[in-house]
Amino acid sequence: MKNELICYKQMPVWTKDKLPQMFQEKHNTKVGTWGKLTVLKGKIKFYELTENGDVVAEHIFTPESHIPFVEPQAWHRVEALSDDLECTLGFYCKKEDYFSKKYNMTAIHGDVVDAAKIISPCKVLDLGCGQGRNSLYLSLLGYDVTSWDHNENSIAFLNETKEKENLNISTALYDINAANIQENYDFIVSTVVFMFLNRERVPSIIKNMQEHTNVGGYNLIVAAMSTDDVPCPLPFSFTFAENELKEYYKDWEFLEYNENMGELHKTDENGNRIKMKFATMLARKK
């Protein structure tokens, strides 16, 4: 698993005098963050601690040492042991956490992470990509990604980020209501987008998506619902009814289909994330 970690922040080289005080005191790494200490010169002492600050183990590291990753939330501190110390610290995470940790973006959608475990890198269209959280992740994994959104600022942010990360993502301003996909794709992704589309255009949009998915290709849709038992709490322009999305894809093979409660990142007046029902579907074209 350590092979899958990626560095999202590299600290400068520290000497004995520049070693930050916080690292010399009891502290821990964040959830989902691994620390990688590298000694370039001299010696440093590494203390493994309990939450109460009791020493569990001590290690002396030099440039020749094989230094393991500091696990997430592990309590520790360091101490310079030589005047000529030069060291640095890198912060690592899993690929699915990289963009949220580095750029403070919304987390990759969990269903995209799951889909990427079973769908090999291929030609992908991220329909309604927003700032590109899913697009950037899929591109990082080696997918050939095209990303469309109607929001200029979102596309500009994605373009800026892909340049910084040297990722090859094709972007465009696009109104999904136009239902005008013209190329074929192996995988079309649309997460938390349908609720902003025009109700009367949805049949054409889905038909257009299906027609431009290669045989054996996939559609992933996560979309808001409104049902008799759980009416949608927000005035979205479109919500799926019970089994409505399933009916559109009745001729496809379902790898996943559920209609479950979920949460938006948006919060109510009390600061709680808004709960509602979502249709989640990963289907393969026969």
UniProtKB/Swiss-Prot annotation:
Binding of S-adenosyl-L-methionine, residues: G128, R133, D149, D175, I176, T191
A single GO molecular function term of this UniProt record: S-adenosylmethionine-dependent methyltransferase activity
Family designation: Belongs to the TehB family.
Induction annotation: Transcription of tehB is independent of both tellurite exposure and oxidative stress.
Keywords of the record: Methyltransferase, S-adenosyl-L-methionine, Transferase, Virulence
Protein name according to UniProt: Probable S-adenosyl-L-methionine-dependent methyltransferase TehB
UniProt entry tagged with the keyword Methyltransferase: yes
Disruption phenotype: Deletion of tehB leads to an increase in sensitivity both to tellurite and to the oxidizing agents cumene hydroperoxide, tert-butyl hydroperoxide and hydrogen peroxide. The tehB mutant additionally shows a significantly reduced ability to utilize free heme as well as several heme-containing moieties including heme-human serum albumin, hemoglobin and hemoglobin-haptoglobin, to support aerobic growth. Virulence of the mutant strain is reduced compared to the wild-type strain in the infant rat.
Matches recorded under Pfam families: DUF1971 (PF09313), TehB (PF03848)
Coiled-coil stretches: none
Entry function: Probable S-adenosyl-L-methionine-dependent methyltransferase. Plays a role in both resistance to oxidative damage and heme uptake/utilization, and is important for virulence of this organism in an animal model of invasive disease. Also protects H.influenzae from tellurite exposure in vitro; however, since H.influenzae grows only in humans, it is unlikely to encounter tellurite in its natural environment, and it is thus probable that tellurite resistance does not represent a biologically relevant role of TehB.
InterPro entries: DUF1971, RmlC-like_jellyroll, SAM-dependent_MTases_sf, TehB-like_dom, Tellurite-R_MeTrfase_TehB, Tellurite-R_TehB-2
Enzyme Commission number(s) from the entry: 2.1.1.-
GO cellular component, one term: cytoplasm
One of the GO BP terms on file: methylation
Top-level division of the source organism's lineage: Bacteria
